[in-house]
């Protein structure tokens, strides 16, 4: 993987990731394909939204169908028929999400499978082995996602464990002679001093890119923006910066303003299935009865398949009847909206007009623009 920084506007960065499987223009949003599919979408439909890279979930694919089945097809790209690059998370966040079903030890994590209740063990080495078999273009280190809230002592202990696991992930990755990219994950909760220690430790080990983890886990939005403003500028300029699990459209905008290059989140797909649709003028709740006879499209500025062919009344009707097509059309639109937003941000950075773009974005959705402390 090669990262090229093309130009900047304030802290925002316009760049390009180049892989053997193709290039990714940044800032980029990665749709989430947890089980080897972006829910309800064919790979061709995902591609048509403008997505250039997907996220796959190591934890879930390991438990079902298992790496052996996927490897028999070649790798995850072959299994799901996606031609572009794939980033896989390491499984750390999913283990964190299990709560009391898991025990964290120095060697790794013991937990009960959410599928059949059997005891399972996951370690940095096992995570690297799984991701190697998946053929991930970007491999994520295995880490512990520090919960929120956490005391200073708890955050320190968790962050130090993640650093030791980062070294073990790097060692196994190098043993494999894996030709793909390996990203480190900065932890440290909402404490600046621990974010510094984490980043210093990771840069000493050396990675192809750096993710910011442990945000969007329940902390106030102000804390997320504060940590981003603090740590993002300290990440090596020649490496991509990835904000994990974020987020709403305004979170993407604020992340870009603070120098983030990559994002992923289930929000556009999950919200689509629940009838929450993102548009240039804010969120439309398609289940609201006011849309029952509305013959307009979702978004007059959107050229996605859904907006070119269907009305709000039809989408309301499909949702009311529980038709699968409704969820699919909603998903096509939301993913297209996210990609259109990212394209707009990229073009604004290129033109040196990011803040003008951001002003218009907030005016249209009817929200106040957050202050940026630069």
From Swiss-Prot:
<feature type="binding site">
    <location>
        <position position="214"/>
    </location>
    <ligand>
        <name>substrate</name>
    </ligand>
</feature>
<dbReference type="GO" id="GO:0008479">
    <property type="term" value="F:tRNA-guanosine(34) queuine transglycosylase activity"/>
</dbReference>
<protein>
    <recommendedName>
        <fullName>Queuine tRNA-ribosyltransferase</fullName>
        <ecNumber>2.4.2.29</ecNumber>
    </recommendedName>
</protein>
<comment type="similarity">
    <text>Belongs to the queuine tRNA-ribosyltransferase family.</text>
</comment>
<dbReference type="GO" id="GO:0101030">
    <property type="term" value="P:tRNA-guanine transglycosylation"/>
</dbReference>
<dbReference type="Pfam" id="PF01702">
    <property type="entry name" value="TGT"/>
</dbReference>
<feature type="active site" description="Proton acceptor">
    <location>
        <position position="89"/>
    </location>
</feature>
<comment type="function">
    <text>Catalyzes the base-exchange of a guanine (G) residue with the queuine precursor 7-aminomethyl-7-deazaguanine (PreQ1) at position 34 (anticodon wobble position) in tRNAs with GU(N) anticodons (tRNA-Asp, -Asn, -His and -Tyr). Catalysis occurs through a double-displacement mechanism. The nucleophile active site attacks the C1' of nucleotide 34 to detach the guanine base from the RNA, forming a covalent enzyme-RNA intermediate. The proton acceptor active site deprotonates the incoming PreQ1, allowing a nucleophilic attack on the C1' of the ribose to form the product.</text>
</comment>
<keyword id="KW-0819">tRNA processing</keyword>
<keyword id="KW-0328">Glycosyltransferase</keyword>
<keyword id="KW-0808">Transferase</keyword>
<feature type="binding site">
    <location>
        <position position="333"/>
    </location>
    <ligand>
        <name>Zn(2+)</name>
    </ligand>
</feature>
<dbReference type="InterPro" id="IPR004803">
    <property type="entry name" value="TGT"/>
</dbReference>
<feature type="binding site">
    <location>
        <position position="304"/>
    </location>
    <ligand>
        <name>Zn(2+)</name>
    </ligand>
</feature>
<feature type="region of interest" description="RNA binding; important for wobble base 34 recognition">
    <location>
        <begin position="269"/>
        <end position="273"/>
    </location>
</feature>
<comment type="pathway">
    <text>tRNA modification; tRNA-queuosine biosynthesis.</text>
</comment>
<keyword id="KW-0671">Queuosine biosynthesis</keyword>
<feature type="active site" description="Nucleophile">
    <location>
        <position position="264"/>
    </location>
</feature>
<dbReference type="GO" id="GO:0005829">
    <property type="term" value="C:cytosol"/>
</dbReference>
<feature type="binding site">
    <location>
        <position position="187"/>
    </location>
    <ligand>
        <name>substrate</name>
    </ligand>
</feature>
<dbReference type="GO" id="GO:0002099">
    <property type="term" value="P:tRNA wobble guanine modification"/>
</dbReference>
<dbReference type="GO" id="GO:0046872">
    <property type="term" value="F:metal ion binding"/>
</dbReference>
<feature type="region of interest" description="RNA binding">
    <location>
        <begin position="245"/>
        <end position="251"/>
    </location>
</feature>
<keyword id="KW-0862">Zinc</keyword>
<feature type="binding site">
    <location>
        <position position="143"/>
    </location>
    <ligand>
        <name>substrate</name>
    </ligand>
</feature>
<feature type="binding site">
    <location>
        <begin position="89"/>
        <end position="93"/>
    </location>
    <ligand>
        <name>substrate</name>
    </ligand>
</feature>
<dbReference type="InterPro" id="IPR002616">
    <property type="entry name" value="tRNA_ribo_trans-like"/>
</dbReference>
<comment type="subunit">
    <text>Homodimer. Within each dimer, one monomer is responsible for RNA recognition and catalysis, while the other monomer binds to the replacement base PreQ1.</text>
</comment>
<feature type="binding site">
    <location>
        <position position="302"/>
    </location>
    <ligand>
        <name>Zn(2+)</name>
    </ligand>
</feature>
<dbReference type="InterPro" id="IPR036511">
    <property type="entry name" value="TGT-like_sf"/>
</dbReference>
<dbReference type="InterPro" id="IPR050076">
    <property type="entry name" value="ArchSynthase1/Queuine_TRR"/>
</dbReference>
<dbReference type="GO" id="GO:0008616">
    <property type="term" value="P:queuosine biosynthetic process"/>
</dbReference>
<feature type="binding site">
    <location>
        <position position="307"/>
    </location>
    <ligand>
        <name>Zn(2+)</name>
    </ligand>
</feature>
<keyword id="KW-0479">Metal-binding</keyword>
């Amino acid at each position: 993987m090669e990262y090229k920084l093309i130009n900047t506007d304030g802290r925002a960065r316009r760049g390009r990731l180049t892989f053997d499987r193709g290039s990714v223009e940044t800032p980029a949003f990665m749709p989430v394909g947890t089980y080897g599919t972006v829910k309800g979408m064919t790979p061709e439909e995902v591609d048509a939204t403008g997505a250039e890279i997907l996220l796959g979930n190591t934890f879930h694919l390991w438990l079902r169908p298992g790496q052996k089945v996927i490897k028999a097809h070649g790798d995850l790209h072959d299994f799901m028929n996606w031609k572009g690059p794939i980033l896989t998370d390491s499984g750390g966040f999913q283990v964190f999400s299990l709560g009391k079903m898991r025990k964290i030890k120095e060697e790794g994590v013991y937990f009960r499978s959410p599928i059949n209740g059997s005891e399972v063990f996951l370690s940095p080495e096992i995570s690297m082995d799984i991701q190697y078999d998946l053929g991930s273009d970007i491999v994520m280190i295995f880490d512990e996602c520090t919960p929120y809230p956490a005391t200073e002592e708890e955050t320190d202990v968790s962050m130090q464990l993640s650093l030791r696991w980062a070294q073990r992930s790097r060692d196994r990755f190098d043993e494999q002679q894996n030709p793909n990219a390996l990203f480190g994950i900065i932890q440290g909760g909402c404490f600046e001093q621990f974010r510094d220690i984490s980043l210093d430790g990771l840069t000493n080990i050396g990675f192809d890119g750096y993710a910011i983890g442990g945000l969007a886990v329940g902390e106030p939005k102000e804390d997320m923006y504060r940590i981003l403003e603090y740590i993002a500028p300290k990440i090596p300029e020649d490496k991509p910066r990835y904000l994990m699990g974020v987020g709403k459209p305004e979170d993407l905008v604020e992340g870009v303003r603070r120098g983030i290059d990559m994002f992923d989140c289930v929000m556009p797909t999950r919200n689509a299935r629940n009838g929450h649709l993102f548009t240039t003028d804010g969120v439309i709740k398609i289940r609201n009865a006011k849309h029952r006879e509305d013959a307009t499209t979702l978004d007059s500025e959107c050229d996605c398949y859904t907006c070119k062919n269907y009305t709000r009344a039809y989408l309301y009707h499909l949702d009311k009847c529980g038709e699968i097509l409704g969820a699919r059309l909603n998903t096509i639109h939301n993913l297209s909206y996210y990609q259109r937003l990212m394209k707009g941000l990229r073009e604004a950075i290129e033109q040196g007009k990011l803040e003008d773009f951001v002003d218009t974005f907030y005016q249209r959705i009817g929200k106040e623009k957050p202050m940026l402390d630069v």
